[in-house]
């Protein structure tokens, strides 16, 4: 267990950092795994796996961080093999799973179309009877990885769908906006040409499309701490994930 020690490092601080990291890894649930949900376009005879390298890079990074064995070449081959066997007539949702023991599996389904604008809810309002904590803990390291331990997220977006919406938004212990159950969120304030999205430090998954948007200067997007009021008062709301792209949304 290491902690990037340099000549100027404080040995006590470095030791404490190692203890924190060790506690995190040793407390991981035995069944926790990782997964990537990937868009596969197979229309008009053209096959393309969207954000292919970005998904594999994230999977590789998280597997290393969580000490989950991963054969990245096998993952790549499985993904490409699966894509080649899908009919070239639609867009598909392809899910690549990595178990705690390093076992790979894959599944796929046709991706349905969405309306031009989707409704989002607040998770704490639509899951009032939930036994899980609905406030994300920003210091939870697992939030930085797309793990299979996402029950409360899944409950939230599934409840939103049952109410005619698409997703539900979460806040953290400080009342800051974090993300949706299956999307990142961007808001554009009134009288501004910038898109704002919560920082990873709020307890946010580094979404593949989110990262791409932030890297593109033409989109004028940046990280900022946001509250419920910022969303309510926003001029525009946009959800994003690599599966669906950018999705116009409303409360």
Each language-model region and where it sits:
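Helix-start/capping segments and mature chain N-termini
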Residues: 1-93, 97-251
């Amino acid at each position: 267990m290491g902690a990037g020690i340099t000549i100027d490092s404080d040995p006590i601080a470095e030791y404490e950092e190692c203890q924190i990291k060790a506690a995190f890894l040793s407390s991981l649930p035995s069944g926790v795994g990782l997964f990537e949900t990937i868009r596969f376009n197979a229309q008009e005879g053209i096959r393309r796996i969207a954000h292919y390298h970005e998904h594999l890079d994230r999977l590789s990074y998280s597997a290393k961080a969580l000490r989950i064995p991963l054969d990245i070449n096998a993952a790549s081959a499985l993904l490409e093999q699966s894509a080649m066997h899908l009919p070239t007539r639609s867009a598909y949702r392809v899910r690549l799973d990595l178990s705690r023991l390093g076992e790979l599996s894959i599944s796929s389904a046709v991706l349905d179309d969405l309306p031009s604008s989707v409704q989002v809810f607040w998770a704490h309002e639509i899951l009032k009877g939930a036994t899980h904590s609905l406030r994300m803990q920003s210091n939870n390291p697992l939030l930085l990885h797309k793990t299979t331990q996402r029950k409360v997220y899944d409950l939230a977006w599934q409840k939103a769908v049952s109410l005619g919406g698409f997703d539900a938004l979460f806040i953290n212990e400080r009342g800051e906006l974090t993300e949706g159950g299956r999307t990142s969120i961007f808001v554009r304030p009134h009288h501004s040409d910038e898109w704002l999205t919560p920082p990873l430090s709020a307890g946010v998954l580094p979404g593949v499309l989110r990262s791409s948007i932030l890297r593109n200067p033409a989109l004028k997007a940046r990280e900022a701490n946001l509250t419920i009021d910022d969303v309510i008062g926003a001029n525009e709301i946009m959800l994003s994930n690599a599966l669906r792209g950018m999705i116009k949304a409303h409360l």
